[in-house]
C-alpha cells in the first residue's frame, strides 16, 4: 500500500487501503497529483 507515497502524493489515496485507491497506487498514473 505504501507504494503510493513513492509514486506520487495524493491526499485522498496515500496510505489508503480502499481497493480503488490501492489500484490507483499500483498504477502510479491514475492520480492527478502524480
Swiss-Prot record:
GO terms for molecular function: ion channel regulator activity; toxin activity. Expressed by the venom duct. Keywords: Disulfide bond, Ion channel impairing toxin, Neurotoxin, Secreted, Toxin. It comes from the Eukaryota. It is found in: Secreted. One of its GO terms (cellular component) is extracellular region. Contains 4 disulfide bonds. The cysteine framework is XXII (C-C-C-C-C-C-C-C). Acts as a neurotoxin by inhibiting an ion channel. This is Turripeptide OL127.
Amino acid at each position: 500500500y505504501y507504494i503510493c507515497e513513492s509514486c506520487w502524493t495524493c491526499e485522498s489515496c496515500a496510505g489508503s487501503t480502499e481497493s480503488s485507491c490501492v489500484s490507483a497506487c499500483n498504477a502510479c498514473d491514475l492520480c492527478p497529483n502524480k
